[in-house]
Amino acid sequence: MAGSVIQGENYRISVLTESLVRLEYSEGGVFEDGQTQVVQNRDFGPVACEVVETEEVLDLHTEHLHLHFEKGPFTPDRLFIELKGQYAVYGSRWHYGDQPETLKGTSRTLDEVDGAMELEDGILSKAGYALLDDSSSYLYDVESGFRARPCPEVDLYFFGYGRDYLGALKDFYHLTGQPPLLPRYALGNWWSRYWPYTSQEYTDLMDRFKAEGVPLAVSVIDMDWHKTAIPARFGSGWTGYSWNRDLIPDPAAFLHG
């Protein structure tokens, strides 16, 4: 693992880039270098880093960050990281245990969602810093697959990129692996119209696309295929698995159309 690594009996601090630092604390003194469910590649190459260390205190400087650690368990009064730049009214200093307010991330699924939903935290923030907590993820290798960590540990990644959001995303993907490309079939023509089609109207529409020589990769029948005027106790009417037989009297024949 390239970059600067400072390790004690129960802690390890790895400077991955001038703006990205890994913080580990393990009561058993066991640290992980392998892949996890989230992290695949921690090798970013050499990093310019200045370390000032005594038996009690560690100060670490990169071009963009200053880390101060009074050796011992990670606590708010012992460990902080400060960005070298004014990104918030009262400065951009993170103390261990603080939960940064981020610009949020994404949702993995819409299962059981009926209305607004809370997004997970992301790695971008108006304050200039954010956290990725990898402490609870499983370890992974090709031969044995997923397995639990042999020793519980704090395993955090501090992203201190200021307003360099593209840089943060670039290094995030370097750390976690590139997302898969969209499948080729998803890049074709999609047809989706919010309209109460009958099964005959929709079949006629598909026949017209074929007659006009317009290929379709995906065809969406939107939401009127199911009942929408339903009792409130069943939900909002925006979802469901009923069939509106006034519009689609023979669902099986329609689907096999």
Segments from the language model and where they lie:
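Short, Gly/Pro- and small/polar-rich lid/capping loops
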Residues: 1-2
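A low-complexity, Ser/Thr/Gly/Pro-enriched, surface-exposed linker/loop concept
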Residues: 16-55
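Catalytic and substrate-binding clefts that recognize carbohydrates or anionic sugar/phosphate headgroups
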Residues: 52-184, 193-194, 199-200, 206-211
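Aromatic-lined carbohydrate-binding/catalytic grooves of carbohydrate-active enzymes
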Residues: 180-257
